[in-house]
């Protein structure tokens, strides 16, 4: 019994020593951790002071780690579809934009030229009215179309001659009427043995027409 008690006492003492030793190790580890944290705090304070001095008294944030740069992408919308290209330098993207702008400008210029070429000629209102009112011009145009159909050489209409013909139309009509009345009067005179009232009236009307023609 004495031996067992001695062994137990010895084991108990060893256990107590082991516990005490582990407690001391833990204390030492805690002291080391505290010292490290204190050193880190001091280092951070020094860095903040240096940052303030460099920024002119303003606080400056130092990033711990910079994120990786995103690769440059080019997105193109064309024909209702979306195309995305990776790793496109800015110079190449600018060149593509210049080429697209030049192509768009050329397409718009082509459309405008085509619209101008297709536009029908507009006839002025004054010329249209003159063509509708003047029968002489209509007759000359019909003569020109007939000459084209038959293969004859065309003769250009002179505006001064057209105006002269328009002015001479009433005089020509009066002269033809005068000649007709004179012939009719001569026929009646030759047939009748003596002058009648109707012939006298016709002579008077013929004299009036002659007087009007001379006055003009």
Curated annotation (Swiss-Prot):
A motif (Nuclear localization signal) lies at residues 172-179. Residues 67-102 form the Tify domain. Ubiquitinated. Increase in jasmonoyl isoleucine (JA-Ile) levels mediates its degradation via COI1B-mediated proteasome pathway. One of its GO terms (biological process) is floral meristem determinacy. It is found in: Nucleus. Residues 1-38 have a biased composition (Basic and acidic residues). Its main location: nucleus. It holds the Pfam family Jas_motif. A motif (Jas) lies at residues 170-194. The keyword Lipoprotein does not apply. InterPro entries: CCT_CS, TIFY/JAZ, Tify_dom. Expressed in roots, stems, leaves, spikelets and seeds. Induction: By abscisic acid (ABA), wounding, and drought and salt stresses. Induced by jasmonate (JA). Negatively regulated by the SCF(COI1) E3 ubiquitin ligase-proteasome pathway during JA signaling. One of its GO terms (cellular component) is nucleus. Residues 1-47, 184-216 are annotated as: Disordered. Keywords: Jasmonic acid signaling pathway, Nucleus, Transcription, Transcription regulation, Ubl conjugation. Repressor of jasmonate responses negatively regulated by the proteasome in an SCF(COI1) E3 ubiquitin-protein ligase complex-dependent manner. Involved in jasmonate (JA) signaling pathway during spikelet development. Targets directly the transcription activator MYC2 and suppresses the activity of MYC2 in triggering the transcription of MADS1. PANTHER family: PROTEIN TIFY 3A-RELATED (PTHR33077:SF61), PROTEIN TIFY 4A-RELATED-RELATED (PTHR33077). Belongs to the TIFY/JAZ family. Interacts with COI1B in a coronatine-dependent manner. Coronatine is an analog of jasmonoyl isoleucine (JA-Ile). Interacts with MYC2. The jas domain (170-194) is required for interaction with COI1. This is Protein TIFY 3. The gene is TIFY3.
């Amino acid at each position: 019994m004495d031996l067992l008690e001695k062994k137990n006492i010895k084991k108990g003492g060893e256990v107590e020593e082991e516990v005490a030793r582990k407690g001391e190790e833990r204390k030492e580890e805690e002291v080391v951790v505290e010292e490290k944290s204190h050193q880190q705090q001091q280092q951070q304070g020094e860095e903040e002071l240096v940052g303030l001095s460099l920024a002119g008294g303003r606080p400056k944030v130092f990033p711990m780690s910079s994120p990786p740069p995103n690769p440059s992408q080019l997105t193109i919308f064309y024909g209702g579809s979306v195309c995305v290209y990776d790793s496109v330098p800015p110079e190449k993207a600018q060149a593509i934009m210049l080429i697209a702008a030049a192509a768009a400008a050329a397409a718009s210029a082509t459309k405008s030229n085509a619209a101008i070429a297709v536009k029908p000629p507009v006839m002025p209102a004054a010329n249209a009215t003159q063509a509708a009112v003047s029968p002489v011009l209509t007759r000359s145009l019909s003569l020109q179309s007939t000459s084209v159909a038959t293969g004859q050489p065309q003769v250009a209409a002179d505006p001064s001659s057209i105006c002269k013909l328009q002015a001479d139309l009433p005089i020509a009509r009066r002269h033809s009427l005068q000649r007709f009345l004179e012939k009719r009067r001569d026929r009646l005179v030759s047939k009748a043995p003596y002058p009648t009232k109707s012939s006298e009236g016709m002579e008077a009307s013929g004299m009036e027409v002659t007087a009007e023609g001379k006055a003009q």
